């Protein structure tokens, strides 16, 4: 008998991609101790953004379990639009930092 596992669809924060689905996801070893949901903005591999950062590395594309884990991170858009309300933080500073990566929060 087959086992069916329900999984959450990744990248629920995406609104629109320019053309095809050519998003720059990179595998990053994230060392934040706690679990983080998809859509968390990362200041760096060890820190979730708090809203005041001038630069970020990207947005988690997958849920990250507790402890160190290698996960997909959206590090650059093509350009791409993301849903600001679905991100962990969407202050003006974070929106500006994401725009520098061609990721536009709407």
Each language-model region and where it sits:
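Surface-exposed, low-hydrophobicity beta-strand/loop segments enriched in small/polar/acidic residues
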Residues: 1-106
